[in-house]
Amino acid sequence: MYTDIYTASLPPELLAMAETPVMQRLLRVGMHCGCEYTVYPIYRDAVAPYSRYTHSLGTAAIVWHFTHDLKQSVAGLLHDIATPAFAHVVDFLNGDHMRQESTESRTRMMIASSPELMALLDKSGLTLDDVDDYHRYPIADNDSPRLSADRLEYTLGNAHLVFHCPKAELKRIFDDIFVGKNEENVDELCFAHAEIADIFTQLSLRQSEWFVSDEDRFSMQALADLLREARQRNVLTVDDLYLDEPHVIALLLSDPVLTARWQDYRRIIGTRSGAQKPEGTYAVKIAAKKRSIDPLVQTCDGLRRFTTVNADYASKLAAFRSDDFDRWVWAKYE
């Protein structure tokens, strides 16, 4: 597995927490927000499925590698514990497609409601307050466009599993990273060499563009609308969304109307777009949160943001950020 580049070993206490039922649930929640159930070529050609569990354990491993602090590493492990089925699709369902944070509100409750996890925290000398919010630990998480363990992990994970970046290249990137002080004198993951930062940012920008592509935005809104209809038809509840994807899919398939809608969703192979909404066709005009990374890199003048030392990346990142999504998007089917 690509994640073994992050650290040679993890604390047994942390590994035990990863084995609890509340964490094992994340094996059945994907990283790609339901889009992987379509027949988009990018998912059809993926190396392997990418689960929230893999990402969570990888994030914990990165935090451990750079801090060797159990509290911070466990917070990294648990940061996605409240992720619902289809992940950020539920943010679209909640009207939070621009911030995509609405599902995080259950994090503390999900931890506290797991007797196995709470017992392991107590045994490790940790409290709920220590681990319920990884935002307080800057190596684990920080504000975009800074680089954190969370952003680093899903960028490398997608680079390998979706973009077919060799594991050796991931290791080359990871081994170049160190902890430095940013503009606010706060710890941040940084690159030692500009040429490695260049490789990483090309992967990161490709990912950023994909995360807000017409295909991604359309699919997430379409699936959110399908879940909304399922709730209106009393086929599922909000709590059902916090189980796992096989459970939610089984509920959709229990209703003939929703079964047809789900089967149509699974046949989406691409999208079309235009200034006018096509008549008689399901179409959406929806914006989305733009995720991007502008890492710090070591230069002869100290640490600087990569956009200040690489004009090409600065130009491409600015172009990415300028898209206003002012177009209608609809599906192409297999």
Can you say where each PLM-predicted feature lies in the sequence?
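Short alpha-helical catalytic segment bearing the HExxH-like zincin motif
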Residues: Q72-D80
